[in-house]
Amino acid sequence: MRYLFPTRWKVQKLDRLGFVGRGRSRHRPRNEPSLYGGEYPFFQTGDIKAANLYLSEYSQTYNEKGLAQSKQWEPGTLCITIAANIAETAILGIRGCFPDSVIGFIADPAKTDVHFIKYYIDL
């Protein structure tokens, strides 16, 4: 463990503190033009890396076809990159989709706070 915490705290796996799920982009190739150009924000790993705390700026959007092969995540979801820019984090400020190169974490408020998890990963 990198840091000492109060002895009453217990080390937990992330999935014990909330929901952990992988982003979704089923269609191959992922860059198929017919998936893009709609109203649904699609966050890439570079967007997450560029965000300071909250993620609301995006470089691409999905249309209905793109959304159908993906998943929308709610604001407050912690995005953690697992490819290209590894372990970069940002909290969704708006609804949006992200590819399978990103993990989404939704904190159980009775167990932890998404900001704490973000800052712990970022340390």
Predicted regions located by residue number:
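Basic, amphipathic alpha-helical recognition segments used for DNA target recognition
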Residues: 13-19, 49-55, 72-75, 91-97, ...
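Short glycine-rich, flexible loops that bind phosphorylated cofactors or substrates
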Residues: 88
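DNA target-recognition patches
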Residues: 15-18, 29-64
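A generic structural signal for residues embedded in beta-strands
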Residues: 80-81
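Short, well-ordered loop/turn elements at secondary-structure boundaries
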Residues: 36-38, 73-76
